[in-house]
């Protein structure tokens, strides 16, 4: 059976969450961490409280504390949320640090690395695909070993693509290893955003979100099948129903 961190959206395993720069990924990620650590609902889904370890590698503790204070409206940060602003790179001690943290906190469910680029070695040997596959594979091995989710915050390329998941920065090696991928689409300064989700253990779907006071709330969601149905013009559905009612068509 699939072990869900967020039912239907985020299972255990390796996950990617990619979006444009300055699109609000870190705010959204911190809110998710708080909700999971407190066992509060996420987008109409009931959450089992778990320890969350958040490597926020582009922030200071003061900035994180200010954001948490704003997100929880002056309340206390949950004990199950463990904040880290530094860690070694992949292959240089990160795996050992994760081992230690998982053994220290027995109910760890989610580890967030924000951002992936901060823990990469930038090794030019072997080519981009091989390096992406090796580094992501090392983290997936840890996620599978402990039955947890490791969520990597990442960037999108600026170039557009017909498939939004092709905009994830790096090679296809990252997507090839990841069990789950989220792509955030947001126009700059817009209060709305879409998150497209795909994964081995879930149906493809799109979440339509709205931001208010740095919290992203769910306005609507649809599966890939529902989205395809909506894309068909009404007159075609009416024609299909008419043909079905008369039994044949001559023209």
Language model feature labels by segment:
Residues 28, 32:
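Hydrophobic positions on the alpha1 helix immediately C-terminal to the Walker A/P-loop
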Residues 16-18, 22, 26-27, 53-55, ...:
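Phosphate-binding/switch region of NTP-binding enzymes
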